[in-house]
């Protein structure tokens, strides 16, 4: 019974639409009607500012981490923490508190990985910010980090680097999360190909573009 309750709790944690609620409560703004229309960290930064964007990222990240740690906190045996983390990502992507229309799962997925394999998460953060510095595109950085996650989870155990051994469930979860993130960024990928993607004012390309509808 406790397992079912915690699994539901993991989904509900993921379902917290932090950007949407921050916009509505503190700014009287519906993020879905502004910028890209997304309720995640990037659009929150653009529309509501740095403080709101950072708050959104922190909440989205740590709701993934907390969900992953639930079975450890409650000394639950028999179910991998990754299953709880995956449910949080599903909740973030299809939140019951926001009409099942959620974000692109980047921050929450990172939080899940941090809760299970923090050094691997650090590796992905380096890849993410390296790609962001080179391309000035959050979407490109997210997709690049997703691909790097797949490469890392498959190759690192061969050399005992960062990951000491193969974990079939961790590999499956990484493949699932990477696929989800890439699919959720399909429109961004099209804009990258067309050279019309939104840029952030940081890195080698400091050009700023208005968010596209």
From Swiss-Prot:
One of its GO terms (molecular function) is acyl-phosphate glycerol-3-phosphate acyltransferase activity. Residues 23-51, 101-142, 185-213 are cytoplasmic. Inhibited by acyl-CoA and 1-acylglycerol-3-phosphate. The chain crosses the membrane at residues 4-22, 52-74, 81-100, 143-161, 163-184. It holds the Pfam family G3P_acyltransf. Optimum pH is 7.4. One of its GO terms (biological process) is phospholipid biosynthetic process. It is found in: Cell membrane. GO terms for cellular component: plasma membrane. It catalyses: an acyl phosphate + sn-glycerol 3-phosphate = a 1-acyl-sn-glycero-3-phosphate + phosphate; hexadecanoyl phosphate + sn-glycerol 3-phosphate = 1-hexadecanoyl-sn-glycero-3-phosphate + phosphate. It is a multi-pass membrane protein. InterPro entries: G3P_acylTferase_PlsY (IPR003811). Changing residue 36 to A: Loss of acyltransferase activity. Keywords: Cell membrane, Lipid biosynthesis, Lipid metabolism, Membrane, Phospholipid biosynthesis, Phospholipid metabolism, Transferase, Transmembrane, Transmembrane helix. Probably interacts with PlsX. PANTHER family: GLYCEROL-3-PHOSPHATE ACYLTRANSFERASE-RELATED, INNER MEMBRANE PROTEIN YGIH. Catalyzes the transfer of an acyl group from acyl-phosphate (acyl-PO(4)) to glycerol-3-phosphate (G3P) to form lysophosphatidic acid (LPA). This enzyme utilizes acyl-phosphate as fatty acyl donor, but not acyl-CoA or acyl-ACP. Belongs to the PlsY family. This is Glycerol-3-phosphate acyltransferase. It comes from Streptococcus pneumoniae (strain ATCC BAA-255 / R6). The lineage of its organism: Bacteria, Bacillati, Bacillota, Bacilli, Lactobacillales.
């Amino acid at each position: 019974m406790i397992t079912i309750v915690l699994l539901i709790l993991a989904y509900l944690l993921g379902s917290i639409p932090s950007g949407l609620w921050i916009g509505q409560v503190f700014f009287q703004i519906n993020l879905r009607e502004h910028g890209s229309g997304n309720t995640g960290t990037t659009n929150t930064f653009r529309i509501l500012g740095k403080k709101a964007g950072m708050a959104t990222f922190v909440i989205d990240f740590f709701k993934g981490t907390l969900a992953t740690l639930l079975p450890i906190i409650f000394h639950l045996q028999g179910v991998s923490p990754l299953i709880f983390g995956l449910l949080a990502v599903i909740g973030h992507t299809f939140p019951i508190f926001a009409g099942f229309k959620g974000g692109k799962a980047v921050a929450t997925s990172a939080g899940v990985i941090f809760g299970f394999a923090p050094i691997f998460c650090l590796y992905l953060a380096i890849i993410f910010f390296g790609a962001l510095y080179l391309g000035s595109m959050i979407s490109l950085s997210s997709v690049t980090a997703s691909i790097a996650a797949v490469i890392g989870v498959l190759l690192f155990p061969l050399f005992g680097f960062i990951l000491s051994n193969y974990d079939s469930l961790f590999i499956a979860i990484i493949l699932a999360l990477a696929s989800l993130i890439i699919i959720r960024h399909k429109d961004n990928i099209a804009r990258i190909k067309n050279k019309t993607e939104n840029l952030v004012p940081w890195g080698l390309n400091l050009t700023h573009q208005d968010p596209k509808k």
